[in-house]
Every structure is written in structure tokens, then in C-alpha cells.
């Protein structure tokens, strides 16, 4: 047996798409064997419904009569029959003779067909003139490249002759003695066995569950082609009805019809009395224009059946069962047009909101710095509180979260606050106004789609601190004067505390950032988003700056987008990273001094200034790749001694591990160190007393490797140049960078035994609170220790 024959004998036809599949591509867990492609397309939860629909439709339309080749390999003792080339030629000659007779009969039926199709008379006439010789309205000569089972006139006529001659069941193999030239042999050319898919032979009245097709034998290629194109499946079991009245009684299996026919109303001449149904296990191709083979114009139908409903039926799931097509092309089983329109509008609205968010994040660095001080300060303060939860005033179960702010203005108009809200929480649906999300919440609550709400700020409440139950009106936090930047944000007692729900940490900013930030190698530096760089992988990312900024710099807020996009990556991977760190035998940097984990990093000046804006794709093609990189780096670059003795205030413990030995890993390791600490800031906010621990986490993220620096680092006090990996960084103000001598003097001046605040002399507050940050005792000891041995990456 040749390799081709072995291969064909192993193939099984899918019940829905009728394509020959290898056993590994078939799934047997349902009532009929189906291929993985159909299951994936329809969905495992709906596939049984689709199978039952297909079964009913095939039975209703007489698909299980003679002439269709069966499916799986034959059982033991049953031999398949293959025709030689000579026999195939004789069969083809007989088919041609039958075609001539069938053509004459079909031409008579064309007139009756046209009278029945009042709504489609003109299109029907054009189509009938194009049918290839046979002029049968349903058995079309479709282009072989477009339709899977286009039927030629000769093949269709041969099928008719075969069906008329053969009256016995197609499952009785081997066939009875029939002359080699008879077309009945042609109707069962492909090899197969007596039962479809191994099922027992069904009774004539119920018909087989499906007709599985084998690949044709290599020794009968010509005849098998004729069989597949013309007689595969009991195509025409009845010739024109001599009694007149109806159209010709032709039974054509749906799986042999073009998909444009399957998804549209079937012809009254093609299908028996049962009403037409929409089948189609796949979305159909675009219907051919009227007059072209396979186009809607070829659809014969009873009065009131519209051919245009083909596109309507194809627009919804093809698994809808027993859907009658009405005169207007409406399908009762489909989703109503108003629901479809509403869904379409919602998708468009969400796309527009995401576009606004993307634009806001992309231009934030340039725009926020140029905005008036009141606008900039308000945005910084509000951004430092995100994300936080909001709910609908009338239904507390409807929850969303505010995750970003921006200021917009039209020419000649004042600035107005814009806030971005995700609703429902974790859904990724973004609203760019409070009124928009309040309207949607109202519709979800009251099921009233007509009413709009005047002001969303009156209907939304925010929780000041997660879990406290202290819900306040959003309009009190953001009154009109604040929204138009006439006044500053109310006092700190009104500001919500950031909270990132661990169950749905993915913020919509990630979707926006990832979509516009292609992946880059781990060692690639981040570049500005709008920079027309030739390095496509990093062109959309922001370049990290290590040189000091002006004291009133909005650098932190300018990096909101990147911080947010990193934030939900960290939250997604937080638990895995914690396990990795604990397995590595050292504490997270944020825990190095034994303090509790700090709260989630607010997306404002604090975390943004202190954490370089880097996106997850830079660590690799996926977050998991980045996580693996984290684990590898943590396992080799740190030791328990490092983690406890040198904190990130000095930026040396982790920075030194990324020095000369492996330059390519510098950005990656700095990222890892920041993510280590930051992910501890993600899940639940403890009291502000834990915030001083933040200065362990962030400062090392500000100074960069010389590879990525755009300028020298200088001490804020003495203006001497700083070491790239060894200095003190204020976690609240990015421009506060200090050398060790100045930091040492400041600590001594403040008194090392009490609270020691920023060496600048200011009590720089933590974002979202009035509590100033202070050095931890371990950090003070490190700074006062004088010369610190900077360990190299490969040191024992």
C-alpha cells in the first residue's frame, strides 16, 4: 500500500466542515466527531448545539440519500472498491451522456422557477444564464477556488443518473455487480466503510448522523475527482417534478452547496417543503455580486424569502438553529438590531476612549510641563491617588476605578479636568468622563437606555481608603472649581488612597502602552515615545534621565503612563515574584530593614519620579519572560548580606550588581530591583508609617547606567558630580539627589538618633499624605559608615 493510501485510510471527515482530518486533529468528546478547528471556532460550550442544528438541517433537506461517499476506514472483512483509469473514463462518458438529458429537463424547470421568485426575478434570470450548462439553480458551477464543492454540469447530471439508478443504501459495501460504465459506480467512488464515523447504520427514515468522507484512492484520481465534484453525497435524488406546481425536487446536501447559499435563504427549488434554514459552520465569504456564480441572485426562494438575508444571517453566529428567514431578511433567533447597534456604539465609544487615553499618555511629558502651575499641581496630586474605586450611588454593586487624569482645553477655552474610569472593574472598558460611566451604570442598574445623566459627579462615590467603608461623593472631591482648575484640590483628608485590586490588577493603561510599545531586548534603553528613532523596539518608550531637574519639575507625573503600564505587569506577577524571592533566600528590598511592605505605589510624582518609565515588553516578548529574567537576576545578583546591609537609598546593592561585568543586564537589573519593591507596594496599602521604606525601593531606579544617561548626575547641595551607582535619592522629589558626604553631614546635623528627613532640609511628603519620608536606621548606618565596599556581580 502506498504512503498516500495509508494516509488517506487514516483520515476522518469532520462532521461540520466535512474536511478530511488526521486522527490527532479530531475530537471525539461530542456526539459527532469534529475537528479541532471547528471546536475552536464555535466554542466548546456551543459545539454540541451546532452539531444538533446541522444534524436537523441535513435530515430536513434530504442530505442522507444515495450517492454520498462514507467516511472512516472499513471494518475488518470489508474491502473498498477503487476504479481503474479505464473504468473512470467509462464512467465519465456515461456522466456526459446523462448531463445532456438532464440539461434539457432543467431548462424546462427554469421558467417555473422564475415565476416563483417574484422578489428576485431579475437577479434570478441573470444567474440562470450563467449556470454552467446545467442551469440548475442550486447546483452551481462555482469557481473551484472560491467554493469548496462547486459542481459542474456533467458531474451534477451524473449524480442525477446515479441517484435514479441506485435505490439501495449507500452503506452496503461492496457494491452489487454493475457495469463499469454505469454512473452508479461513480456515485460511490471514494473508499470508505459501511457506517459513518463508526456509527451503526441508521434507519432510512432517520438518516445517518453524518457522511464522513475519505480521501480518494490514488489509483482512481480522475474518477474520484468526478465523484467529489459531482456525486459526493447523494446530490440529486429526484428529477424535475412532472406534476408541475413546485420547482424541481432536488436534494443537495448543505455541505456541498456554496457557503453563500448555506448562510442565506435556500431555494424552494433546492430544498424540500420544510422552511429554509441558516446553517453554515463558518462565517461565509462575501457574497458574489448578482449574476456571478454563487451570488445571492442564484437563490431560488418562495415568495417572501429575500436573498439579501444571506449577509444578515452571516453576521451573527452560524450556530443559530432553525432560523427561518422572513421577507425582510430578519432572523427571529438573532440578536435584535437595537442590541447590535448598541453593542457597536459601545465598541466605538471604548475605542475612542482608549485612543484618548493613548494620546494623553503619549503627550504627557511634553504637555504637562508646559501647563500652568495650578493645572500641573492639581494633576500631580490627583494622579498620586490613582487607582481608586468608585461606585454608582444608586447601586453599590456597580464598581469601577479611576486610574488616570489629564487636562484638556480647546482653543480659547480654559483647561478642564479629564478623568479616565474603567467600568466594570477589570473589564478594560474605559470611559473618559464621569457622566459617561454614570450613564452606563444607570443603564445597567435601571435597564433604561434612553435617559442620560446631567452630571456623573453627582452619581458616583469614591472610597477614601479601601475597606474602610468611607464612601464619599466624587463631586465633593472634584467640584466644578477644581475641574476647571480655578481652585486647588481639597485637603488631604479628602484624597483617596491608591488601591490596586490584586484580583484584577491590569489597568487599561497597559493595553494602551503595550499596543504602542513593541518589545525591546532586555538591555535596550528606553527612548521617548514620540522620538522618531530608527530603533523601532524602543522608539515609543521614554528615555530615562539621571541629571537633576528643576525643583518644581513635573517629571514624576510626566511618566504616569509608563509607571502604570509597569504597575499592572508587576501586580500580575506579584505572587510569583514573591515566591521567587523567598526561594532565593533574601528579603525584598522594600523589606530589607524589616519594615512592612509599603502601600501600592501611587501613580503620581512619588512612584513616577522614582521609578524609570519602562514597559513590560522591554524585558522580553511577554510578562512571563520578564518574570523569568527577574528570577534569574535575583538569584545571582543578590545575597542576604547585600539585601540587609546596603539599601536602595545608596542605590549600590542592586546597582553595583549591574555594573561592568554584564553591561547588557544593567537596565534589566535596575528594573528588577524596582519591581521587587514596587510589587510589594501593589496589593494592599498599610498605614503611612510604612512609607519610609519606599526610599529603599525607588532611588536606585532614578540613577541610570552611563549607557542610558543623557547627562551627568550632580548633587543637589554641592553640585559635584555623583557616582552613577552610589548616591542618595529622595523618593518624593526626583531632583533631590545627594552625594554621600552631603548626606552624611545632613544626617549628623539632624541627629542620627531621631527622625532624619531629606538632606535638602525639606520635609518632603509622601504622595497622597502629609507624612514626610524619613531614612531608616539601616540606611543611616550605611551612609555614616563611610566607604562602602561595592560588591561586584561575580563576587562570592
From Swiss-Prot:
It is an enzyme of class 2 (transferase). SUPFAM superfamilies: RING/U-box. Residues 218-227, 304-324, 522-540, 648-667 have a biased composition (Low complexity). Residues 174-345, 515-556, 585-698 are annotated as: Disordered. Keywords: Coiled coil, Disease variant, Epilepsy, Intellectual disability, Isopeptide bond, Metal-binding, Nucleus, Phosphoprotein, Transferase, Ubl conjugation, Zinc, Zinc-finger. InterPro entries: I2BP1/2_C3HC4-RING_sf (IPR044882), Interferon_reg_fac2-bd1_2_Znf (IPR022750). The modification Phosphoserine is found at residues 69, 215, 519, 547, 639, 657-659, 662. It comes from the Eukaryota. GO terms for biological process: development of secondary female sexual characteristics; negative regulation of transcription by RNA polymerase II; nervous system development; positive regulation of transcription by RNA polymerase II; protein ubiquitination. It is found in: Nucleus. The keyword Ubl conjugation applies. Its main location: nucleus. Highly expressed in the heart, moderately in skeletal muscle and pancreas, and weakly in brain, kidney, liver, testis, thyroid gland and lymphocytes. Residues 232-248 have a biased composition (Gly residues). Its EC number is 2.3.2.27. Pathway: Protein modification; protein ubiquitination. Probable E3 ubiquitin protein ligase involved in the proteasome-mediated ubiquitin-dependent degradation of target proteins. Through the degradation of CTNNB1, functions downstream of FOXF2 to negatively regulate the Wnt signaling pathway. Probably plays a role in the development of the central nervous system and in neuronal maintenance. Also acts as a transcriptional regulator of genes controlling female reproductive function. May play a role in gene transcription by transactivating GNRH1 promoter and repressing PENK promoter. It is linked to Neurodevelopmental disorder with regression, abnormal movements, loss of speech, and seizures: An autosomal dominant disorder characterized by global developmental delay or neurodevelopmental regression, hypotonia, progressive ataxia, intellectual disability, seizures, and abnormal movements. Interacts with CTNNB1. This is Probable E3 ubiquitin-protein ligase IRF2BPL. The lineage of its organism: Eukaryota, Metazoa, Chordata, Craniata, Vertebrata.
Amino acid at each position: 500500500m502506498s504512503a498516500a493510501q495509508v494516509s488517506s485510510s487514516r483520515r476522518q471527515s469532520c462532521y461540520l466542515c466535512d474536511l478530511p482530518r488526521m486522527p490527532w486533529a479530531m475530537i471525539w468528546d461530542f456526539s459527532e466527531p469534529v475537528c479541532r478547528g471547528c471546536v475552536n471556532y464555535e466554542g466548546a460550550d456551543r459545539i454540541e448545539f451546532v452539531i444538533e442544528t446541522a444534524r436537523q438541517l441535513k435530515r430536513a433537506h434530504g442530505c442522507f440519500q444515495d450517492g454520498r461517499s462514507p467516511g472512516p476506514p472499513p471494518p475488518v472483512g470489508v474491502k473498498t472498491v477503487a476504479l481503474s483509469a479505464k473504468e473512470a473514463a467509462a464512467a465519465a462518458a456515461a456522466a456526459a451522456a446523462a448531463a445532456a438529458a438532464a440539461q434539457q429537463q432543467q431548462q424546462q424547470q427554469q421558467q417555473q422557477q422564475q415565476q416563483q421568485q417574484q422578489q428576485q426575478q431579475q437577479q434570478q434570470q441573470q444567474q440562470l444564464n450563467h449556470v454552467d450548462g446545467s442551469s440548475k439553480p442550486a447546483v452551481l458551477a462555482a469557481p473551484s477556488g472560491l467554493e469548496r464543492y462547486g459542481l459542474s454540469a456533467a458531474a451534477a447530471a451524473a449524480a442525477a443518473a446515479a441517484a435514479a439508478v441506485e435505490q439501495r443504501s449507500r452503506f452496503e459495501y461492496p457494491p452489487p455487480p454493475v457495469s463499469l460504465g454505469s454512473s452508479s459506480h461513480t456515485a460511490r467512488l471514494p473508499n470508505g466503510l459501511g457506517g459513518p464515523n463508526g456509527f451503526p447504520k441508521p434507519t432510512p427514515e432517520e438518516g445517518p448522523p453524518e457522511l464522513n468522507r475519505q480521501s480518494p484512492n490514488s489509483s482512481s484520481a480522475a474518477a474520484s475527482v468526478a465523484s467529489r465534484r459531482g456525486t459526493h453525497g447523494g446530490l440529486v435524488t429526484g428529477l424535475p417534478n412532472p406534476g408541475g406546481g413546485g420547482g424541481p425536487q432536488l436534494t443537495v446536501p448543505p455541505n456541498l452547496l456554496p457557503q453563500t447559499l448555506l448562510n442565506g435563504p435556500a431555494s424552494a427549488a433546492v430544498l424540500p417543503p420544510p422552511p429554509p434554514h441558516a446553517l453554515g459552520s463558518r462565517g461565509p465569504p462575501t457574497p458574489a455580486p448578482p449574476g456571478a456564480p454563487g451570488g445571492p441572485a442564484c437563490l431560488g426562494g418562495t415568495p417572501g424569502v429575500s436573498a439579501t438575508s444571506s449577509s444578515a444571517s452571516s453576521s451573527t453566529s452560524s450556530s443559530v438553529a432553525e432560523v427561518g428567514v422572513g421577507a425582510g431578511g430578519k432572523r427571529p433567533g438573532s440578536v435584535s438590531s437595537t442590541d447590535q447597534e448598541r453593542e457597536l456604539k459601545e465598541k466605538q465609544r471604548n475605542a475612542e476612549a482608549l485612543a484618548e487615553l493613548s494620546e494623553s499618555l503619549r503627550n504627557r511629558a511634553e504637555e504637562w510641563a508646559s501647563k500652568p502651575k495650578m493645572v500641573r499641581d492639581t494633576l500631580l496630586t490627583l494622579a498620586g491617588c490613582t487607582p481608586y474605586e468608585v461606585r454608582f450611588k444608586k447601586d453599590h454593586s456597580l464598581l469601577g476605578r479611576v486610574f488616570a487624569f489629564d487636562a484638556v482645553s480647546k482653543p480659547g477655552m480654559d483647561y478642564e479636568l479629564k478623568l479616565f474610569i474603567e467600568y466594570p472593574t477589570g473589564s478594560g472598558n474605559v470611559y473618559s468622563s464621569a457622566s459617561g460611566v454614570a450613564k452606563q451604570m444607570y443603564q445597567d442598574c435601571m435597564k433604561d437606555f434612553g435617559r442620560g445623566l446631567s452630571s456623573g459627579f453627582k452619581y458616583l462615590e469614591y472610597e477614601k481608603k479601601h475597606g474602610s467603608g468611607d464612601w464619599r461623593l466624587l463631586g465633593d472631591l472634584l467640584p466644578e472649581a477644581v475641574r476647571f482648575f480655578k481652585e486647588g484640590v481639597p485637603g488631604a483628608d479628602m484624597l483617596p488612597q491608591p488601591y490596586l485590586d490584586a484580583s484584577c490588577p491590569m489597568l487599561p493603561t497597559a493595553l494602551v502602552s503595550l499596543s504602542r510599545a513593541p518589545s525591546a531586548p532586555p538591555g535596550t534603553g528606553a527612548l521617548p515615545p514620540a522620538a522618531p528613532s530608527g530603533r523601532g523596539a524602543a522608539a515609543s518608550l521614554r528615555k530615562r534621565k539621571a541629571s537633576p531637574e528643576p525643583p518644581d519639575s513635573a517629571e514624576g507625573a510626566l511618566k504616569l503612563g509608563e509607571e502604570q503600564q509597569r504597575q499592572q505587569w508587576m501586580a500580575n506577577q506579584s505572587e510569583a515574584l514573591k515566591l521567587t524571592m523567598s526561594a532565593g533566600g533574601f528579603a525584598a528590598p522594600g523589606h530589607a530593614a524589616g519594615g512592612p511592605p509599603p502601600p501600592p505605589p501611587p501613580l503620581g510624582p512619588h512612584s513616577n519620579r522614582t521609578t524609570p518609565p519602562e514597559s513590560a515588553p522591554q524585558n522580553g516578548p511577554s510578562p512571563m519572560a520578564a518574570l523569568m529574567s527577574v528570577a534569574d537576576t535575583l538569584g545571582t545578583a543578590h545575597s542576604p548580606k547585600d539585601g540587609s546591609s546596603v539599601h536602595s537609598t545608596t542605590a549600590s546593592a542592586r546597582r553595583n550588581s549591574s555594573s561592568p561585568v554584564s553591561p547588557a543586564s544593567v537596565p534589566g537589573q535596575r528594573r528588577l530591583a524596582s519591581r521587587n519593591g514596587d510589587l510589594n507596594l501593589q496589593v494592599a496599602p498599610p498605614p503611612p508609617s510604612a512609607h519610609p521604606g519606599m526610599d529603599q525601593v525607588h532611588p536606585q531606579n532614578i540613577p541610570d547606567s552611563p549607557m542610558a544617561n543623557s547627562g551627568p548626575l550632580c548633587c543637589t547641595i554641592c553640585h559635584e558630580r555623583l557616582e552613577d551607582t552610589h548616591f542618595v535619592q529622595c523618593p518624593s522629589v526626583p531632583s533631590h539627589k545627594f552625594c554621600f558626604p552631603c548626606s552624611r553631614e545632613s544626617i549628623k546635623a539632624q541627629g542620627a538618633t531621631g527622625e532624619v528627613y531629606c538632606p535638602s532640609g525639606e520635609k518632603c511628603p509622601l504622595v497622597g499624605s502629609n507624612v514626610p519620608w524619613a531614612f531608616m536606621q539601616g540606611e543611616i548606618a550605611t551612609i555614616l559608615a563611610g566607604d562602602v565596599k561595592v560588591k561586584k556581580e561575580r563576587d562570592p
